[in-house]
């Protein structure tokens, strides 16, 4: 992720589930990405470059996974489903949905039990490349962030 995604985006939230994952990112400014494209001496528009970075990340992960488990073949479908957060409520809903996803799928009973998402990175004091400050500022405090996530709300499939 550091090599491919972080140069073009800030990771806000993620959740890794056995058969899928969710990732909420904020892409860097067009100027920053254009400078990155120029520094790599490439001729590509910013949107294509961002998608190429994701493609490279998926391929890199698949190769490492296949090597580790002595297997061959693809891990991911040929498309990435994307949703754009249009409002502040969308961002809050996406973060909540992503962090509650393992509970929703019955993989754990409480968010804090799932180790494969960004929730624990937000509440931890350990160093992280996740945008922890974003969460604290967005929700007002770490306590407010935790309080929202303690809600026992059923998730609706919002085409995520």
Predicted regions and their residues:
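Short catalytic/metal-binding and nucleic-acid-binding patches
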Residues: 1-160
